[in-house]
């Protein structure tokens, strides 16, 4: 169901939650535990935030620095799909246009389309 329809059809205060994907290298279980706790509030949807890439600079020791792109919280699309499938709650991935190339943005949108995730915050 579309978020706007969920909001309009609700006769009482409605809740939604914004979550962060797990840090790179960690699992999703802690996130599931958090959602299990929050489900008692009957959230109408869950927003999954995307974090843009960060840049760190490595000193090469010769007066030059190497710029490296780092994504600490990848997985917005995968987390959205996992939540939607596990909990049957509408998900709203927050997709950024900065920090990604046009091609990367297109791939994210295509992945969401394939997963039938149609509600987006851009």
Name the predicted role of every residue range.
Residues 22, 41-76:
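Glycine-rich, proline-tolerant flexible connector loops at the mouths of alpha/beta enzymes
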Residues 13, 64-90, 96:
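Flavin-dependent oxidoreductase catalytic cores
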Residues 13-21, 44-48, 91-95, 120-122:
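Hydrophobic faces of well-ordered beta-strands that scaffold small-molecule active sites
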Residues 21-23, 53, 96-100:
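Short histidine/acidic/glycine/proline-rich micro-motifs that form metal-
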Residues 1-17, 84:
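N-terminal amphipathic alpha-helix/helix-capping segment at the start of soluble metabolic enzymes
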Residues 26-32, 97-114:
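Glycine-rich anion/phosphate-binding loops
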Residues 1-4, 32-36, 76-81, 109:
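Generic structural signal for well-ordered alpha-helices
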């Amino acid at each position: 169901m579309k978020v706007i329809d969920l909001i309009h059809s609700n006769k009482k205060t409605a809740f939604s939650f914004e979550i962060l994907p797990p840090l790179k290298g960690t699992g999703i279980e802690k996130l599931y535990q958090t959602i299990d706790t929050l489900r008692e509030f009957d959230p109408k949807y869950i927003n999954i935030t995307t974090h843009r890439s960060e840049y760190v600079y490595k000193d090469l020791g010769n007066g030059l620095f190497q710029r490296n792109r780092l994504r600490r919280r990848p997985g917005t699309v995968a987390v959205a799909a996992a939540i939607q499938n596990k909990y049957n709650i509408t998900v709203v991935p927050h997709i950024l246009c900065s920090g990604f190339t046009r091609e990367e943005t297109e791939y994210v949108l295509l992945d969401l389309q394939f997963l039938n995730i149609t509600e987006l915050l851009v």
